Amino acid sequence: MSRFHRYFKKCEEFALCAEVGDANVIQVEDVSERYTLYQIVVKGSGRMGKIFDSDYIVGDVNGVYFADLKEYLGHHTVFESFEPVQMYGFNTLDLKQDWDGKLIENSFQGDDKSWLVCFKGNPIINGKELRVMDYAKLENKHYNVQLNDAIVGVFTKL
């Protein structure tokens, strides 16, 4: 029985992945599948690195861990969970296309090169309640945000 489950959602200009797993699980990702630019860990902890490399990043989540993983593109990677984990990845569809990513904490000004993604909870954005893995193309306008302890990212095509 698998102790680590992966989900993938292809969107219009990017893809989202989700991983949910038990403690003490090792997951390997082949270079041909490595399109993740940003990792958002919402529960648990673990470490990730390039295979056969002694350098790795540790995500110890007391809140949220948001990591830029661009340096891992083009490499086989390995992830080890220290405790039950739930994490999401923001993936480019084209390795030549770069994106900027960040988590939002307040209301903000959007632009038409950006997308909003909900990773945890039920925030209210401009009066609309979102669910996990909901996403929307932004416009050049102001967005009123009520996070309600949710985790929401904004990703901008460069």
Model-found features: residue ranges?
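Jelly-roll (double-stranded beta-helix
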Residues: 1-158
